[in-house]
UniProtKB/Swiss-Prot annotation:
GO terms for biological process: ubiquitin-dependent protein catabolic process. PROSITE patterns: UBIQUITIN_1, UBIQUITIN_2. The keyword Membrane does not apply. This is Polyubiquitin 4. It comes from Arabidopsis thaliana. Keywords: Cytoplasm, Isopeptide bond, Nucleus, Repeat, Ubl conjugation pathway. The lineage of its organism: Eukaryota, Viridiplantae, Streptophyta, Embryophyta, Tracheophyta. The gene is UBQ4. Belongs to the ubiquitin family.
Length: 382
């Protein structure tokens, strides 16, 4: 299939790829076309930085998707700024930049005046005259941006997809007004919006003050679907997921929605309804699945196996893996479970440090083997 890669200069490169290609493979193709070494490439899709050992399919990158290529600068460094809406901005900075400088860069990118910006790192609000180095902010650190409001207040609206929208409102705004603001931001007509707060559905003519909705309250937005309907998916752990679907959705579509919500790759999902396993190409209508039906989700482990990872604190983590998984993949799974970035992980087995590009099979790591995880310290020189 073809995908596109857009550079910061606005140039678009077209690549021929397979869903099974790893991010490493894609970077090698970009190097062939553009001469940029893979270690200077960072690829972004849907706001996420893509990890080398993962595949295009893992990130649900489909034909004609567009990736963004950001170059990793030698002397400078990149940091990320996350807004309350969940958007992540990438900035090129130097350790010697002041917080004022950083706010000016955010203004250049996003148009937000510095005096409305509050930057938070490691739970601390950053002061304008200090530098990034003063706060020990290093490459690929993430700052959080909170807007300082004048007069009004901010509230949050959380959608069923998990996205959070930030709105500027007054206590005297009516629910109609709020729905109009959501329409401005997201394009959803007010008559398709249902807003919930403290378990109550909010009525159009009433104000935020009537419902005691105060600054930084979170409302929940549920869509009233036209031809659409809700179905439930129950996992083996007993968790129930709610999905917005159409009768004409295929089983593939449903699995993609589950991936969006839960991060489970479609090829590891088996969906069961009325005792039957559902086939990818068929639609919900084919199986007579109607509104508020419940499907059952069973995970397919592929000739997978379990291994254990023991940390220096004595904690043991259990991972589901394949023999063909690379050490990169294993580190990504540890990151998913424990939040430890791969570049801070060293894995040891049988007294040997494991190299990223090699597979578990290369090291004869079999089911129920135990790896040891040692953390690589930032300032360290491993």
């Amino acid at each position: 299939m073809q995908i596109f890669v857009k550079t910061l200069t606005g140039k678009t490169i077209t690549l021929e790829v397979e869903s099974s290609d790893t991010i490493d493979n894609v970077k090698a193709k970009i190097q062939d076309k553009e001469g940029i070494p893979p270690d200077q490439q960072r690829l972004i899709f849907a706001g996420k930085q893509l990890e080398d050992g993962r595949t295009l399919a893992d990130y649900n990158i489909q034909k004609e998707s567009t990736l963004h290529l950001v170059l990793r600068l030698r002397g400078g460094m990149q940091i990320f700024v996350k807004t309350l809406t969940g958007k992540t901005i990438t900035l090129e900075v130097e350790s010697s930049d002041t917080i004022d400088n950083v706010k000016a860069k955010i203004q250049d990118k996003e148009g937000i005046p510095p005096d409305q910006q509050r930057l938070i790192f490691a739970g601390k609000q950053l002061e304008d005259g200090r530098t990034l180095a003063d706060y020990n902010i290093q490459k690929e650190s993430t700052l959080h941006l909170v807007l300082r409001l004048r007069g009004g207040m901010q509230i949050f609206v959380k959608t069923l997809t998990g996205k959070t929208i930030t709105l500027e409102v007054e206590s005297s705004d009516t629910i109609d007004n709020v729905k109009a603001k959501i329409q401005d931001k997201e394009g959803i007509p007010p008559d398709q919006q249902r807003l919930i707060f403290a378990g109550k559905q909010l009525e159009d003519g009433r104000t935020l003050a009537d419902y005691n909705i105060q600054k930084e309250s979170t409302l929940h937005l549920v869509l009233r679907l036209r031809g659409g309907m809700q179905i439930f998916v129950k996992t083996l752990t007993g968790k129930t997921i709610t999905l917005e679907v159409e009768s004409s959705d295929t089983i593939d579509n449903v699995k993609a929605k589950i991936q969006d919500k839960e991060g489970i790759p479609p090829d590891q999902q088996r969906l069961i309804f009325a005792g039957k396993q559902l086939e990818d190409g068929r639609t919900l209508a084919d199986y007579n699945i109607q509104k508020e039906s419940t499907l059952h989700l069973v995970l397919r482990l592929r000739g997978g196996m379990q291994i254990f990872v023991k940390t220096l604190t004595g904690k043991t983590i259990t991972l589901e893996v394949e023999s063909s998984d690379t050490i990169d993949n294993v580190k990504a799974k540890i990151q998913d479970k424990e939040g430890i970035p791969p570049d801070q992980q060293r894995l040891i087995f049988a007294g040997k440090q494991l190299e990223d590009g090699r597979t578990l099979a290369d090291y004869n790591i079999q089911k129920e083997s135990t790896l040891h995880l040692v953390l690589r310290l930032r300032g360290g020189s491993f």
